[in-house]
Amino acid sequence: MIYLDNAATTRQKPQPVIDAVVSAMTTLGNSARGTHEGSLSASRMIYGTREKLATFFNCPRPDHAVFTANSTEALNMAICGLLDPGDHVIATDLEHNSVLRPLYRLEAERSVSLSFVPADRQGRIDYGEFGRLIRPETRAIICTHASNLTGNAVDIGRVGAIAHAHGLIFLVDASQT
């Protein structure tokens, strides 16, 4: 079969993923809901996964690995949790609504100021523009890894280095990749 209706997360799952989900649904209980084996097994699995994620992302605390229902919820949580009144954020013209909507809401409700690195007609950005847009109140750079609008990939290593060099938070929407 050739599957042509693929969004960021809809591709049909391979059998090992299906097997793992079925196993979890039929053998585990609700985490932290009791002292029975199903609940304890679920808690151990969740904490073990947090430990693996913390190691993978070089995060010093496994309890900082947070699970959400989807990437929109995760992006909203991160964006709304990180930004304070008066902060400045740099994003690109390539962002998905799951980034733009919370940014515009914070612009209206918390006086967060926004700057956007423009994309040309081919969806390419000038990486030097990130540095030119940084101000004393800049708190974060938020960008997509690959645009759902153009399909263009952003060199997040390059953008991350700019953010790191200026002590900024770097938040990547990698939903499309």
List the model feature ranges, each with a label:
Residues 1-177:
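Pyridoxal 5′-phosphate
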